[in-house]
């Protein structure tokens, strides 16, 4: 299983790679939070609570995107192979 870290810069490329990995987990960071949720349909997606709050997206971001703390993100990333598309 791999963790794909994505911002908006290389989002399309990152998603295409993640879709080839049936066990992929995605962590959206920075402006990646503005991506259309439909792009991640059927995928496990996380976002940092602090980044969601900073951008005022608490009410907008779908509940299918799991909110995590930075500490939880570190735990996820240390347990899996990390691929960055930032």
Language model region names:
Residues 59-86:
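C-terminal structural segments of small proteins and small subunits
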Residues 24-31, 44-51:
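Short internal beta-strands
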Residues 18-22, 39-42, 74-79:
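Flexible, charged surface loops at secondary-structure boundaries
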Residues 8-26, 32:
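Histidine-anchored nucleotide/phosphate-binding helix
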Residues 42-45, 63-64:
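Short, hinge-like loop/turn segments at secondary-structure boundaries
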Residues 32-43, 54-58:
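N-terminal beta-loop-helix "entrance" segment that forms/cooperates
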Residues 12-13, 33-35, 69-72:
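A short, acidic, amphipathic alpha-helical segment used as a generic capping/interface helix at domain edges
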Residues 1-3:
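Extreme N-terminal starter segment of soluble prokaryotic enzymes
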């Amino acid at each position: 299983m791999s963790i794909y870290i994505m911002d908006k810069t290389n989002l399309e490329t990152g998603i295409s790679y993640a879709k080839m990995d049936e066990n992929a987990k995605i962590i959206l960071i920075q402006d990646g939070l503005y991506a259309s949720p439909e792009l991640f349909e059927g995928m496990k997606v996380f976002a940092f609570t602090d980044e969601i709050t900073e951008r005022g997206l608490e009410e907008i971001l779908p509940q299918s995107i799991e909110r995590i703390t930075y500490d939880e993100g570190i735990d996820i990333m240390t347990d899996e192979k990390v691929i960055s598309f930032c």
